[in-house]
A protein has these predicted regions:
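Mid-domain alpha/beta scaffold segments of enzyme catalytic cores
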Residues: 1-252
Length: 252
């Protein structure tokens, strides 16, 4: 398959789980990892079956009510229904202890499971890496990771991938190993700086990466899919993906 035939890929965005079919059809065929912010929202999203949307099961670390709703049984059930566990992680806006308790439980239950994890780390980059050092997971994707160069190197050594967006600095984007890069919009957050008009709109990000990596735009698009194919193969996630995405990754 030509890189020009690959649809846009967005590995971290937010879409309301009651989105309509026509609204999804307006997203240009983009493959989107749609995060949820609470277990209740994740359970609602699990009822859907959309060929281009991978619905996550999340507990956003900035939402205290979401953290208290995290249970071992709930995570075990989620890991059988969701390919993506996210948005999860740590945030500096709320107390650390409940966040760590929820994250450690999620990492424990998901150990060895065929899922990918989309991890938030605002203001807690070092503490998040400590948690992943104690409980590593082959499917860890660090969403909008604003750590230092040393922390990026540490995360890469742990096997982490990085979902990046156009609001990140050229310097930080250049620090991340090219083979670990995945695209995101984090829509609807920071639309002015990401320039994403919709979930899956990675046009400006791909322009930035084309200039930064000195690659043609088609090669950047192909790179995203090659990296995702490697990640899903090593985590045994590939058989669980929607058929259309499996075909796309099989051509990488």
């Amino acid at each position: 398959m030509s890189p020009f035939d690959l649809p846009p890929l967005d590995c971290h965005a937010h879409i309301a789980p009651d989105v309509t079919g026509p609204q999804i059809a307006a997203l240009n065929g983009a493959i989107i990892f749609a995060m949820t912010r609470s277990p209740a929202e994740g359970r609602f999203a699990a009822r859907r079956s959309d060929p281009t949307i991978l619905w996550g099961y999340g507990a956003h670390p900035g939402l205290a009510s979401a953290l208290t709703a995290v249970t071992e049984d709930g995570i075990r059930r989620a890991a059988t229904k969701h390919v993506v566990i996210g948005e999860i992680g740590l945030d500096n806006k709320t107390a650390l202890a409940p966040q760590l308790a929820a994250l450690d439980l999620i990492l424990d239950v998901c150990a060895g499971q065929p899922v990918v994890l989309s991890l938030h780390s605002t203001g807690r980059t070092g503490v998040l890496l400590d948690a992943l050092t104690r409980r590593p997971h082959a499917g860890a994707i660090l969403h909008w990771f604003n750590g230092t160069r040393e922390q990026i190197d540490r995360a890469a050594a742990l096997g982490c991938y990085f979902s990046v967006n156009a609001a990140m600095s050229d310097e930080r984007l250049a620090w991340i190993p090219q083979e670990r890069l995945l695209p995101e919009t984090d829509f609807p957050s920071s639309r002015r700086t990401t320039r994403a008009r919709t979930p899956g709109d990675i046009t400006f990000l791909e322009q930035r990466m084309s200039e930064l990596l000195q690659l043609q735009a088609a090669a950047v698009r192909s790179m995203w899919y090659t990296n995702l194919a490697t990640l899903t193969q090593r985590t045994s996630v590939t058989p669980r993906l929607p058929a259309g995405l499996r075909r796309l990754l099989g051509d990488c």
